[in-house]
Design a protein with these regions (language model features):
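Sequence-level preference for short, compositionally simple segments enriched
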Residues: 21-362
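Gram-negative bacterial Sec-dependent N-terminal signal peptides
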Residues: 1-19
Length: 362
């Protein structure tokens, strides 16, 4: 009996400290920290990483719900969760909500996590913007509690953030779930992205490899419920949002023909002659060997503002670079021949070519 108890004790001790092995992890985030290099908040662990001289710093996050909003501003840092569905980082922020400084967050700052460094990896966790979009969506315009600007970002890959790797991560939101900013490069593998209105958007280069892109219904009836992408890719940038061997699916209550594959976003910028829709934004989205479910009806137009503050429309056929190739499923090739990528262009469409290297393997 004594030998058995000793073995059990050793086994328990082994399982207790296995995840905190310094050879594997540099810091541990847990709801119950009780030792050196253990923290209750992810932001505390990131500060430890910033103070460290270690180049590749790994933060392991135990299962739990972490109500935090933060920037990842340390190069070569990894945030690794214990499990994708039970390690949850969440925050309630929408564009029209008031921040602690008494101002509206705005879309770009409504994020839960924003990557502002190079060579950052997120792995095995969920990033959720917990703003109650469905409840807000059904409120009338004269309801004083209604948030008029309901964009709520879960993850933002910031301007100039290079070589971000997002692996086995769920991004949970509704409108504007994922923002990939200009001059950023990111690789998503075996990820799930949920949303409805323009829920993958921005001017960065991003590859979605074997991902599940899930459309969510609106809580009030409408013919068009949303759009998968809204790229603002610079005209001199060859690629924008590229989906490879992925599934573009839906939740059970999403009707057929209710979602656009994407629409061209021309964000307003300030120029020498005024502020208006960026003429150099020619959004790029490609679906390569993807499954397209029946909720998709093709590409759509999007509006912007001209120099005289008049609304103008950008056409998916002429003001964007929207293509698919080798699609399967009910909505395959529904957008027409002009949006089928050529065989020559398809041969060049490797992950290495799009991302400019093999760094995503490391």
């Amino acid at each position: 009996m004594k030998i058995q108890m000793t073995a059990a004790l050793l086994c328990a001790l082994s399982s207790t400290f296995a995840y905190a092995n310094p050879a594997q992890f540099d810091a541990l985030v847990t709801p119950t920290p009780n030792g050196e290099h253990q923290f209750s908040k992810i932001t505390q662990a990131l500060q430890a990483a910033k103070n460290s001289n270690k180049e590749n710093y790994v933060i392991y996050i135990k299962n739990g719900v972490y109500n935090e909003k933060f920037d990842v501003n340390v190069d070569h840092v990894t945030l690794e969760g214990e499990s994708e569905d039970k390690t949850i980082v969440q925050y309630d922020a929408a564009s029209g909500m008031t921040n602690p400084q008494g101002q509206h967050w705005g879309t770009s700052k409504s994020f839960v996590i924003r990557i502002k460094a190079n060579d950052v990896t997120l792995k095995n966790l969920t990033v959720k913007n917990s703003f109650d979009y469905p409840a807000n969506d059904v409120k009338t315009k004269d309801d004083p509690t209604r948030i008029n600007s309901s964009q709520a970002v879960a993850l933002s890959v910031g301007n100039g953030a290079e070589r971000a790797k997002i692996l086995n991560v769920t991004l949970d939101g509704y409108q504007d779930t994922l923002l990939v900013r200009h001059d950023s490069t990111s690789y998503f593998n075996h990820c799930t992205v949920k949303g409805n209105v323009d829920f993958i958007f921005g001017g960065g280069v991003a590859v979605f490899d074997q991902c599940n892109i899930v459309a969510r219904a609106r809580t009030r009836p409408m013919t068009t419920m949303g759009f998968i992408t809204a790229p603002s890719t610079d005209i001199n940038q060859p690629y924008g949002l590229v989906f490879i061997n992925s599934r573009i699916t839906k939740e059970a209550n999403v009707p057929a023909d209710s979602f656009g594959l994407g629409r061209p976003w021309h964000p307003s910028r300030t120029f020498a002659d005024g502020r208006y829709a960026d003429p150099n934004a020619k959004g790029s989205t490609i679906y390569y060997h993807c499954y397209l479910d029946d909720h998709l009806y093709g590409w759509d137009k999007m509006s912007g503002w001209d120099k005289d503050k008049q609304r103008i429309w950008f056409n998916p056929d002429t003001d964007a670079r929207f293509y698919e190739y080798g699609s399967t499923g009910p909505a395959a090739n529904k957008a027409g021949k002009q949006h089928i990528l050529s065989d020559k262009a398809a041969k060049q469409l490797t992950i290495e070519h799009v991302l400019g290297g093999t760094w995503y393997h490391s």
